[in-house]
């Protein structure tokens, strides 16, 4: 079996690779620290199992999932992050990944459990992620129940501080349509200003605040 670990932190990457070797002693395990390196390795030899960190120095891990499936259609993908928020959970569940893990839960142990589960055809969601999932499901005001996919995309850009004109350019829509989306989002969330929307976008995980220099 070919396994690819995609993780930018060197120590964590080595620990995850070790966990894969322990769970699958006969597997060939390769590692990548960036999105670009991961895609290059996938083109050389499509993996059957991918361990994917969702925060990479050269791109969003979940944005990488469709490209991984294009290069390795039958691969099992286990996503992991130390920042599982509502929007990340929603995107991960919609992306067809086979496992979602929170790094704050003894990642080596739960990774071994996840590998066993996904290779057996199951979906694996770690306990902290399960709790968040249950909380979102029980909340009638959860964003995925009241905002359309397009509105979620617009909110993500609002969280980045983009104007209506900039959103229109990014999404290839008219500025008036972008404005209408903004107003509809405000109405649905019962908010009355762009700063409120930006705070909400950050709180729910639509937008991330940079955490300083790249990790080694």
Language-model segments: which ranges?
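Conserved acidic carboxylate
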Residues: 7-9
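Acidic, metal-coordinating helix/loop segments flanking the phosphotransfer/catalytic sites
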Residues: 31-49
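Short amphipathic alpha-helix used as the core "switch/output" element in two-component signaling
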Residues: 62-74, 90
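Short, flexible helix-to-coil linker/hinge segments that flank and couple to helix-turn-helix
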Residues: 89-145, 149, 153, 206
């Amino acid at each position: 079996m070919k396994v690819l670990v995609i993780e930018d932190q060197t120590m964590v990457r080595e620990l995850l690779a070790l966990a894969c070797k322990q769970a699958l002693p006969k597997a060939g395990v390769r590692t990548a620290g960036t999105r670009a390196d991961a895609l290059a390795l996938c083109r050389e030899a499509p993996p059957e199992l991918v361990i994917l960190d969702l925060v990479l120095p050269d791109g969003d891990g979940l944005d990488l999932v469709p490209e991984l499936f294009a290069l390795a259609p039958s691969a099992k993908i286990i996503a992991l992050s130390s920042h599982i928020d509502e929007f990340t959970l929603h995107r991960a569940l919609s992306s067809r990944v086979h496992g979602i893990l929170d790094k704050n839960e003894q990642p080596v142990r739960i990774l071994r459990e996840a590998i066993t589960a996904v290779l057996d055809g199951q979906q694996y969601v770690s306990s902290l992620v399960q709790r968040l999932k249950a909380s979102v499901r029980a909340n009638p005001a959860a964003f995925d129940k009241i905002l359309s996919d397009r509105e979620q995309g617009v909110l993500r850009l609002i969280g980045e501080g983009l104007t209506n004109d900039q959103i229109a350019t990014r999404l290839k829509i008219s500025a008036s349509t972008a404005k209408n989306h903004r107003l509809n989002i405000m109405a649905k969330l019962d908010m009355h200003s762009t700063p409120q929307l930006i705070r909400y976008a950050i709180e729910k995980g639509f937008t991330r605040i940079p955490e300083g220099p790249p990790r080694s």
